[in-house]
Amino acid sequence: MSDTQDNAPASAQGVDQKAAAGCPVAHDSVTAHGSESESPAIDSPTPHSGGRPRTNRDWWPNQLDLSVLSTNSAKVNPLGEDFAYAKEFAKLDVEALKRDIVEVLTTSQDWWPADFGHYGGLMIRLSWHAAGTYRIDDGRGGAGDGGQRFAPLNSWPDNVNLDKARRLLWPVKQKYGQKISWADLLVLAGNVALESMGFKTFGFGFGREDVWEPEEIFWGSEDTWVGDERYVSEKEFVAGVGATEMGLIYVNPEGPRGNADPAAAAHFIRETFRRMAMDDEETVALIAGGHTFGKTHGAGIADDHVGPEPEAAPLEAQGLGWMSSYASGAGADAISSGLEVTWTDRPTQWSNRFFEILFAYEWELTTSPGGAKQWVAKDAEAIIPDAYDAAKKHKPTMLTTDLSLRVDPAYERISRRFLENPDEFALAFAKAWYKLLHRDMGPVSRFLGPWVPEPQLWQDPVPAVDHALVGDADIAALKAKVLQSGLTTAQLVSTAWASAASFRHTDRRGGANGARVRLEPQRGWEVNQPEQLATVLTTLEGIQREFNAAGGTKISLADLIVLAGSAAVEKAARDAGFEVTVPFHPGRTDATQEQTDVESFQVLEPRADGFRNYLRPGEKAQPEVLLVDRAYMLNLTAPEMTVLIGGLRALEANVGGSRHGVLTDRPGVLTNDFFTNLLALGTRWKASESTEHVYEIRDLATDTVKWTASAVDLIFGSNSQLRALAEVYASEDAREKFVTDFVAAWTKVMELDRFDLA
């Protein structure tokens, strides 16, 4: 659905396409030889600031970026830490809200007139483009946080004039205040628009909470809008991005790189929609369903008339961009994509006319008034209404990407089936639209409101709790059983971590609930140590069977995996001299293999997990960069990441029993030895001559190797910010604080997917 068309970052995003440029995190400073510094023997770094005040990033552009671990902190939220969106939403009259949105849709404003007297097409595009940035690789993007309000999304060329749609909705947002988030409103508007034009939607879930600053997302390496450096061949573009060109949601509607070839376009449509978790049928349904309504806008040449995007617009524009000097600049004179296409002769009514018109004509290439490549029906009568003049009609027109649905063999088969079976098409579009709007929201348990349908497979469903939950006495007895089972602390901790740390905060997927670590594909992931995992699960399943057979309360394997890890943490703390109780809240259930889409879960397999000192073979990105990205996925702060690394090293949670970073002679005991030995004087670190990313810590006096460690371990002594945190935990008075903080961070990870506890 479209109305248009750095070098190595110190972030995990984008490193794949930049690996050839070298190490994404430089371990030496960037210097300018021959520059004048206080000491002429020392090269000075060359800052790159473009005239603005210089920051650390300008001086050291490859410095490890920890800022992502403090994005959208409570300090930037004007609603305060006590604000609970679910509680405010409960006060909302959703039917009244829907009526007010319909009023907006059908009340044309002079400052931005409605096409055909209805803003439905505009609002569908608004919602689509809010949700359509989602990508399966890392779960980033999507409509879940209202990020379209901020740069860069608010100024993408594919989002041209959606600022007007958001402004049209402002009176509704103003009226209901915090009872409805912008994130919910942006996608609800399109849903209501469909219903107001006669379409039966599949459902809708509220529950998206607003952010107050944009998420730092790598959208591509290009430094120009609609740049296409991401192409590595005529038929391939790099992994990790969702669109074919910078600033687009999916593909260029004129065709790949502006080449009006519907067959070539189909290849990239399929790939971009796959990266958003859509199959061929969903793709066809979405394109045809969305293009049943509204029109594109290309009344004139944009370069001659259209002003800057919102982020570049002057103060007096007040957040509006793309102001046009072409005639009135709006309505019939509007310029958005430069394309001038109205797909059907009923652009404000649900129908099957998109397919009927697509297959009724042969099509020839033409040029829009805005200079864009589009297609017009050969030998056709003018049957398409004008958006503003009831006396005018136009010949049918289509985009290059519309014709892909007829030219591509697989798409054509689906399209003809939908042409002949309108009800089947309507249901397919309803389900695909629902998936589009909700793909990044996680499980249905997070959804609010009265219109939520039954859970779908792509929502990773788990069964409801159907048994009495364990109490304190049961928990104590189960812990004792686990600790007497013969399983080691390292085995129990590693298994609990493997189960819980699959979570992605970006799209709320993964986590311990469901115990999917015992199912395909997770049970076979190298990072989860399949042989050890099978041993641990077999033992825990035996404990579970015995306990549940006694009658009364029961425990799921999902709960027992977490409880067993927590029991091991408590024992390790006790062995260190500290009595602690790791908080535990039963209520997880066990998913089945039938409830688990193997292909869908495959994207959750980590390329690295620094917490377990794991790096996938052949991985080119720097381990410490990937550690920060993993911490971000787990919604951790820098201090939480730090204390977890130290604790997990002490507990020997490394994959494969690796000794790297286990800087203690008391393994299995929850001590702060990792930090004290990492920062100890009288030693030096040396890169291993035989193993990449491995370092040796040697005694300065004897040059003997005392420990080995990974780059992930060393970064806590090398990076100045992380070293400051490590020093806290290495201090003499920090032993108890270390244990307390580790338990808190551990519990947070174990409960990341317990949305019912919020």
From Swiss-Prot:
Its EC number is 1.11.1.21. Gene3D superfamilies: 1.10.520.10, Peroxidase, domain 2. Residues 1-59 are annotated as: Disordered. GO terms for cellular component: cytosol. There is a cross-link at residues 250-276 (Tryptophyl-tyrosyl-methioninium (Tyr-Met) (with W-128)). NCBIfam families: cat_per_HPI, PRK15061.1. This is Catalase-peroxidase. The lineage of its organism: Bacteria, Bacillati, Actinomycetota, Actinomycetes, Micromonosporales.
